[in-house]
């Protein structure tokens, strides 16, 4: 099968299907790809090829996810679908597959179920901006009751979105049957096109990483005799010009410096941008004043913090996690970008312990300040092995 060329002329958007088990997320994913393939905008994909999701690792955690890509008339989409509920939780918390928007699949025959609620909450916590709703399996209703039943479920789902801080009143809700569309029923194929149109119109194009303020996590530091100190790392976001000011943030008191040289692959550059692995020569910085785990950032755009709330997934024993629960006095290492920092945890909601496999919220207090902000991802480690993954939901101090 000829591979589709990656078309850079169309804006790129990352989306995913979320929702309760067996409500039809994977069938819908296959239906979108298949219906668009008839218009020459995608490769056709069957259910089995998506359901048989390959394993990938993110932050030391194994996650099963399927990635498919397709084009609408105006955009290029990367679409992620996960087979199991735990995979969704891990995927969203680790940011393995960033979502600019999500399609919430709800079986109209069941209405919202526990994981429907959990996925909406997770989407909110990890910063998914907008949700489009697909009410699935409407072909299961008799003709005379379909409209009423679908209307009731739609009201429920809109209420649920609003409850978790999404725009329940204005979110597009499309009702159809993923299975019928996949089987080639023209009426239901048209509904899939309607859904794609709703995603095109309602989910905003993400702000490109290069438009955000410059940030690079420091991976290594060395001295070049006669020239000064060089910090290397991958630029997380933004663009840096030669001779611009940056701040060294985290662990030690924040310090300002000027970047007098930018190198990549042994070549001198005038600028570094998101995605580059670069070496930055820093004016007037001693080798002892800077270390792995700090970040270089555009001045005043990020400050170090020691206390925050987080949403966390704790690995099961089978995933290489702990075999036993942990309690309030647990003090693991929190791994941010390039470094481990010890921290203490305080449970919310009156719980006494956290079991392997739990998805929980708690407050973390680090022993030294680290450059973090809402949405920053981290792993929790114990003796070098990953036992959990988290995302900062709220800064306390």
From Swiss-Prot:
Catalytic reactions on record: GTP + H2O = GDP + phosphate + H(+)
Keywords annotated in UniProt: Cytoplasm, Elongation factor, GTP-binding, Hydrolase, Magnesium, Metal-binding, Nucleotide-binding, Protein biosynthesis
SUPFAM superfamilies referenced in this protein's UniProt entry, alphabetically: EF-Tu/eEF-1alpha/eIF2-gamma C-terminal domain, P-loop containing nucleoside triphosphate hydrolases, Translation proteins
Binding-site positions, GTP: 19-26, 81-85, 136-139
Span of the signal peptide: none
Cell compartments where the protein resides: Cytoplasm
EC numbers, comma separated: 3.6.5.3
Domain tr-type G per the UniProt entry, residue ranges: 10-207
Coiled-coil region list: none
Residue numbers spanned by region G2: 60-64
InterPro entries (alphabetical): EF-Tu_GTP-bd (IPR041709), EF-Tu_GTPase (IPR050055), EFTu-like_2 (IPR004161), EFTU_2 (IPR033720), G_TR_CS (IPR031157), P-loop_NTPase (IPR027417), Small_GTP-bd (IPR005225), T_Tr_GTP-bd_dom (IPR000795)
Record region (G1): 19-26
GO CC terms, sorted: cytosol
Self-association state and partner proteins as the record states: Monomer.
Free-text function comment from the UniProt entry: GTP hydrolase that promotes the GTP-dependent binding of aminoacyl-tRNA to the A-site of ribosomes during protein biosynthesis.
Homology family: Belongs to the TRAFAC class translation factor GTPase superfamily. Classic translation factor GTPase family. EF-Tu/EF-1A subfamily.
UniProt cross-references to HAMAP family, sorted A to Z: EF_Tu_B
Protein name as annotated: Elongation factor Tu
């Amino acid at each position: 099968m000829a591979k589709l060329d990656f078309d850079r002329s169309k804006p790129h958007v990352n989306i995913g299907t979320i929702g309760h088990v067996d409500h039809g997320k994977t069938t819908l994913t296959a239906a979108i790809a298949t219906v668009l393939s008839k218009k020459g905008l995608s490769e056709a994909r069957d259910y089995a090829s998506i359901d048989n999701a390959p394993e990938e690792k993110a932050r030391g955690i194994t996650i099963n996810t399927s990635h498919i890509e397709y084009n609408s008339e105006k955009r290029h989409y990367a679409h992620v679908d996960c087979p199991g509920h735990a995979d969704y939780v891990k995927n969203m918390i680790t940011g393995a597959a960033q979502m600019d928007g999500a399609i919430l699949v709800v079986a109209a025959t069941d209405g919202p179920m526990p994981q429907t609620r959990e996925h909406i909450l997770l989407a909110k916590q990890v910063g998914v901006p907008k949700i489009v709703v697909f009410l699935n399996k409407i072909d299961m209703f008799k003709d005379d009751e379909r409209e009423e039943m679908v209307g009731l479920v739609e009201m429920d789902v809109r209420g649920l979105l609003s409850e978790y801080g999404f725009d329940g009143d204005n979110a597009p809700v499309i009702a159809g049957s993923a299975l019928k569309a996949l089987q080639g029923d023209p009426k239901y194929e048209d509904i899939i096109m309607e859904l794609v149109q709703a995603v095109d119109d309602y989910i905003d194009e993400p702000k490109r990483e290069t438009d955000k303020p410059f940030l690079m996590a420091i991976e290594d530091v060395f001295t070049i005799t006669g020239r000064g100190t060089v910090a290397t790392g991958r630029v997380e976001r933004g663009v840096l010009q030669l001779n611009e000011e940056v701040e060294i943030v985290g662990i030690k008191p924040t310090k300002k410096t000027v970047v007098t040289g930018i190198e990549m692959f042994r070549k001198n550059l005038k600028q570094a941008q998101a995605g580059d692995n670069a070496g930055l020569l820093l004016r007037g910085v001693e080798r002892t004043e800077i270390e792995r785990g700090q970040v270089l950032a555009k001045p005043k755009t990020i400050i170090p913090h020691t206390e925050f709330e987080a949403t966390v997934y704790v690995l099961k024993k089978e995933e290489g996690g702990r075999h036993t629960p942990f309690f309030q006095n647990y003090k693991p290492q929190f791994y941010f970008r390039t470094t481990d920092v010890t921290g203490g945890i305080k449970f919310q909601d009156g719980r006494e312990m956290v079991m392997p496999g739990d998805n929980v919220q708690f407050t973390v207090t680090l022993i030294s300040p680290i450059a973090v902000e809402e949405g920053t991802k981290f792993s929790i480690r114990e003796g070098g092995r990953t036992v959990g993954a988290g995302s900062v939901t709220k800064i306390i101090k």
